[in-house]
Curated annotation (Swiss-Prot):
It comes from Tabanus yao (Horsefly). Residues 1-20 form the signal peptide. CDD domains: Kunitz-type. Expressed in salivary glands. Keywords: Blood coagulation cascade inhibiting toxin, Disulfide bond, Hemostasis impairing toxin, Protease inhibitor, Secreted, Serine protease inhibitor, Signal, Toxin. Disulfide bonds join C25-C75, C34-C58, C50-C71. GO terms for cellular component: extracellular space. This is Tabkunin 5. SUPFAM superfamilies: BPTI-like.
Amino acid sequence: MKVLSLIFVIFSVLVLFASAKDPVCDQPKAVRRCFAAFPKFYFNSSSGQCEGFIYGGCGGNENNFNTLEECNAKCA
């Protein structure tokens, strides 16, 4: 019975760590009015998906990815 309990605890911890999301993904989309227009992607925590936006080239935060694949790998 102890072995079964230990296996359950280890499995639960592994699932918890596997589902932990990077805090970068909870940052809001940061759109500032600058003079550039770069197509980028961010993770929308409300919809649970990566979405495109136009990055103005200044300011912002780390929830800013060059490709949809990069965003999905980090956050989805």
